[in-house]
Amino acid sequence: MEIVILPTETTINIQKMEQENTAQGSEKPSVQSVKPWSDQEIRSFLQEWEFLEREVYRVKKKYHIVSKAIAQRLKQRGINKSWKECLQMLISLQDLYFTIQEANQRPRCQPLPCPYGEALHRILGYRWKISVFSGPPCADVVNLAPPEHPPQAYGVPIVFQEPMWAPTPVIYVENPQVPGWEPWNMNGHVPYMYPALPPAAPGPLTQWAISTD
């Protein structure tokens, strides 16, 4: 008599776990098969990146678009890299360049060297300048020196105009003998309005004769 063992729920779950572990084990070699970038591959990557930035994408494009284009051009050179690997390399090199540039802005004895600095500066130098000048406007206002040249040097016209009409100044006198203030009586004396006299024009002083008698 043969014994038939029916699969229970527990055995089914164990079989599923074994299948998942087997699948994960088969995926590990593919992850470990990713080769690191060699120096020559990085230099080829930078050449293609610089070409695309200057000749094709003269305006800033999204990283994944540039990465896909670089991956296609590297494939023509015999370098098989996925666009995701190119994207990771692009972001890593950009972060490296900006981090070293920011560190070199601080006072130090010698500037920090940047790997592949010349190529990265040709590609990312203008972006670094934009990021520096687009900072907060009040960050370094205290350290700014006054302008060396007047506004006229920058072609800004400065016009000094006198008012078209100015009222004649008057002197208001009302009962100068009375020290206190009293309300004005309609039946009383009307105050006078004396125009202010302009100052005398400067001229030669009068020579007075001194009598010797």
Curated annotation (Swiss-Prot):
Family annotation (Pfam families): Myb_DNA-bind_4 (PF13837)
PANTHER family: GENE 12569-RELATED, MYB_SANT DNA BINDING DOMAIN CONTAINING 5
Protein's name according to its UniProt entry: Uncharacterized protein MSANTD5
Species name: Homo sapiens
Gene encoding the protein: MSANTD5
